[in-house]
Amino acid sequence: MAVVTLSEMMEAGAHFGHQTRRWNPKMQRYIHCARNGVHIIDLVQTAVCMNNAYKWVRSAARSGKRFLFVGTKKQAAEVVALEASRCGASYVNQRWLGGMLTNWSTMRARIERLKDLERMESSGAIAMRPKKEASVLRRELDRLQKYLGGLKNMRRLPDVVVLIDQKREYNAVLECQKLDIPVVSMLDTNCDPDLCDVPIPCNDDAVRSVQLIIGRLADAINEGRHGSNDQGDEG
């Protein structure tokens, strides 16, 4: 049985690529045709790639691999947070900060600072500080929660990164390459399939397309860990 059906992908608009002038020729094998100046992705190829990606991710989850979801564009941010949380993965959905992976020791210290501030806030310790100092601490807390909140349970580097919009998250791709972390990536027609390990050719701009693909990958993680699609927890 297919992980995603052609009708599901059509309804989600997963077949719409970018304008033909913006394409990457390396994506040619995944393109069905051009229509009104826009490339149309071959959804038969997408279905095959999605089946392969589902099996790959499920196997990785079954063997205990840890996942990081990355998608910072507006139409992906909410989906990334919801689906990563549902399968117990970590996530970045606001902005990729340079060195998030390659300078992990520093990033880990910032995450610990976030946890300390959260404990101070919940215990009332911040409220007991002078008004100006409390305001500074709360601004720091808000900033850390915004950018690092999805990484609070990530105790070490991820084993797999799931990526939306390769062009936008290019710095994340480079850090993964440097650290030999495999990347599962949605690939629109302007992307480079050589920069990922597990390609999924599809529209990475439409919310419904992102929801469909990322939701199925979250299902694969839960199935690999628990034999079902119920919520998981990486711990």
Curated annotation (Swiss-Prot):
It comes from Synechococcus sp. (strain RCC307). One of its GO terms (molecular function) is structural constituent of ribosome. GO terms for cellular component: cytosolic small ribosomal subunit. PANTHER family: 30S RIBOSOMAL PROTEIN S2 PROKARYOTIC AND ORGANELLAR, SMALL RIBOSOMAL SUBUNIT PROTEIN US2M. Belongs to the universal ribosomal protein uS2 family. This is Small ribosomal subunit protein uS2. The gene is rpsB. GO terms for biological process: translation. InterPro entries: Ribosomal_uS2 (IPR001865), Ribosomal_uS2_bac/mit/plastid (IPR005706), Ribosomal_uS2_CS (IPR018130), Ribosomal_uS2_flav_dom_sf (IPR023591). It comes from the Bacteria. CDD domains: RPS2.
